[in-house]
Curated annotation (Swiss-Prot):
Tissue spec: Pre-B-cells and B-cells but not terminally differentiated plasma cells.
KO phenotype (gene knockout): Cd72 deficiency affects the development and the functional activation of B-cells. The most prominent effects on B-cell development are visible at the transition from the immature to mature B-cell stage.
Ranges in the topological domain labelled Cytoplasmic: 1-95
Protein name: B-cell differentiation antigen CD72
Swiss-Prot/TrEMBL keywords: Disulfide bond, Glycoprotein, Lectin, Membrane, Phosphoprotein, Receptor, Signal-anchor, Transmembrane, Transmembrane helix
Protein encoded by which gene: Cd72
Length: 354
């Protein structure tokens, strides 16, 4: 009771199913690579031990092959396909290697180009670095110079500020001095106005004094008959620009001299007549006022001064003798009144009483 067995040999081929076997075998590697997977029934030789010539009717119907088509046709087609299939991977490998070689060449060319470009860029970078260093050095030098200049400018600025502050202080001091001067000027102007008022007042007083002086001069004119422009103190007797004063106080010669000195005068001296040295010529106004009963101390004459002995032991006084006044010698310690003499003085500003 053995059953019949049909064997199917399945082969997977990336070839589109064509009606013509020649078209299938003539496709290039690209069609081979881009095809779809299909299944194809292949006639195999019968298995040993099995009944020859047996085949499944279903398989024969699927293959679409008539019973009258010989089996040898499938065998030849299968053999030709099997011979053509191994050639496609070799061609692809060659193309792959060729593409890989081209890629390597292109990569090498790119590497060389990149190397050349790198060298160019490196040289440019070095050149740029040198230029940058030179520029940086120049800029640093310029910066140092600018910093030095700025330092000098700062010193000059500080000096200028100090000078400005000093000038401002000087200006303020000058302004204060100017203000003080203005205040002093105002004070001087006020003082000037006040002085003008005082001067005006003094002028009025001077005119009043002139009037009073004129009145006084007219009053004094009554008491003086001398026509000279000199005068003597009140109580003194004027005579030829001299003033005489009669003292009624008794005293020695020395005391009389001191008394006359206290009156800013001296003992009177009278000229001697040419005939008699003892005679005395007295002014008429003075002689009338003398007391004839008394003697008066006077200054020693020139002739009597020549005798030093008589000067040291005796002094001169005058007295009346037979109605005339004569000089006589007496002891200096005797007590007698005296006659003082002084220079007459002029009126102020040369004013004459006449």
């Amino acid at each position: 009771m053995a059953d019949a067995i049909t064997y199917a040999d399945l082969r997977f081929v990336k070839v589109p199913l064509k009606n013509s076997a020649s078209n299938h075998l003539g496709q290039d590697c690209e069609a081979y690579e881009d095809g779809e997977l299909t299944y194809e029934n292949v006639q195999v030789s019968p298995v040993p031990g099995g009944p020859p010539g047996l085949a499944s009717p279903a398989l024969a119907d699927k293959a679409g092959v008539g019973s009258e088509q010989p089996t040898a046709t499938w065998s030849s087609v299968n053999s030709s396909a099997l011979r053509q299939i191994p050639r496609c991977p070799t061609v692809c490998l060659q193309y792959f290697l060729l593409g890989l070689l081209v890629s390597c060449l292109m990569l090498g060319v790119a590497v060389i180009c990149l190397g050349v470009r790198y060298l160019q860029v490196s040289r440019q970078f070095q050149e740029g670095t040198r230029i940058w260093e030179a520029t940086n050095s120049s800029l640093q030098q310029q910066l140092r110079e600018k910093i030095s200049q700025l330092g000098q400018k700062e010193v000059e600025l500080q000096k200028a500020r100090k000078e400005l502050i000093s000038s401002q202080d000087t200006l303020q001091e000058k302004q204060r001095t100017h203000e003080d001067a203005e205040q002093q000027l105002q004070a001087c102007q006020a003082e000037r106005a006040k002085t003008k008022e005082n001067l005006k007042t003094e002028e009025e007083r001077r005119r009043d004094l002139d009037q009073r002086l004129t009145s006084t001069r007219e009053t004094l004119r009554r008491f003086f008959s001398d026509s000279s422009d000199t005068c003597c103190p009140c109580g003194w007797i004027p005579y030829q620009e001299r003033c005489f004063y009669i003292s009624h106080t008794l005293g020695s010669l020395e005391e009389s001299q001191k008394y006359c000195t206290s009156l800013s005068s001296k003992l009177a001296a009278f000229d001697e007549p040419s005939k008699y040295y003892y005679e005395v010529s007295l002014p008429s106004g003075l002689e009338e006022l003398l007391d004839r009963s008394k003697s008066y101390w006077i200054q020693m004459s020139k002739k009597w001064r020549q005798d030093s002995d008589s000067q040291s032991r005796h002094c001169v006084r005058i007295k009346t003798y037979y109605q005339k006044w004569e000089r006589t010698i007496s002891k200096c310690a005797e007590l007698h009144p005296c006659i003082c003499e002084s220079e007459a003085f002029r009126f102020p500003d040369g004013i004459n009483l006449n």
